[in-house]
Swiss-Prot record:
The gene is rpsH. One of its GO terms (biological process) is translation. Keywords: Ribonucleoprotein, Ribosomal protein, RNA-binding, rRNA-binding. PROSITE patterns: RIBOSOMAL_S8. GO terms for cellular component: ribonucleoprotein complex; ribosome. GO terms for molecular function: rRNA binding; structural constituent of ribosome. Transmembrane segments: none annotated. HAMAP family: Ribosomal_uS8_B. It comes from Erythrobacter litoralis (strain HTCC2594). InterPro entries: Ribosomal_uS8, Ribosomal_uS8_CS, Ribosomal_uS8_sf. The lineage of its organism: Bacteria, Pseudomonadati, Pseudomonadota, Alphaproteobacteria, Sphingomonadales. One of the primary rRNA binding proteins, it binds directly to 16S rRNA central domain where it helps coordinate assembly of the platform of the 30S subunit. This is Small ribosomal subunit protein uS8. Belongs to the universal ribosomal protein uS8 family.
Amino acid sequence: MAMTDPLGDMLTRIRNGQQAKKDSVLSPASKLRANVLEVLQREGYIRGYSEDASGKHAALRIELKYFEGEPAIKHVARVSKPGRRIYSGSKELPTVRNGLGITIVSTPKGVLSDNEARTQNVGGEVLAEVF
């Protein structure tokens, strides 16, 4: 059966891995997922990621980050879903926890955090929120 929300699946794997105190989790590879992971790494929510091509299909190995035993990601949620897409202009991008978290946005200039999108004055599809 086909997966209807690949990005939501990856975010759920990250959430479940952190709740189980795993060092890393695997997720099927795609360009969108890699771009979202790049934003999470730049913002300091994960230690890193790498492509793992040892199996039949390419996968992304996501290195989870903890601070004093607590997960770096307290909350991760999909905003724009396959059944209801959410778009926002650069001026209307939502803030998460008064700026303590980030919103991940897919823009014509690539996948960016809300701060980067505001700086570059671009809007787009609001993919997820993280804090």
